[in-house]
């Protein structure tokens, strides 16, 4: 695989640390550096600055807005994902405003954590867990 895009909607530094084994494993398994798309508030560039599994970290705004503004943000996020023509896109969150752009993206393979077969229905069996524990 040439391009692997990993999108994290997690807001905390602790969530980034919990994702380290996943990111390192992807890098070692596919022998390619990852492109990380991360919520700008979690400081991923600072947390991962000494890691070698990524090629680039793109920060995005994952703030909740009004419905009209959210639709515009979803379109912007879809364009951002499509810009990288990834072979594999992994979304570590099941937030609808992140799931929709991933589903409609031009990525060849898509993995979204915490969804059932039809993407509008979320898997709520692990709702008592934090985002990090779900990974």
Name every feature range the model reports, one short phrase each.
Residues 1-135:
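Catalytic machinery of carbohydrate-active enzymes
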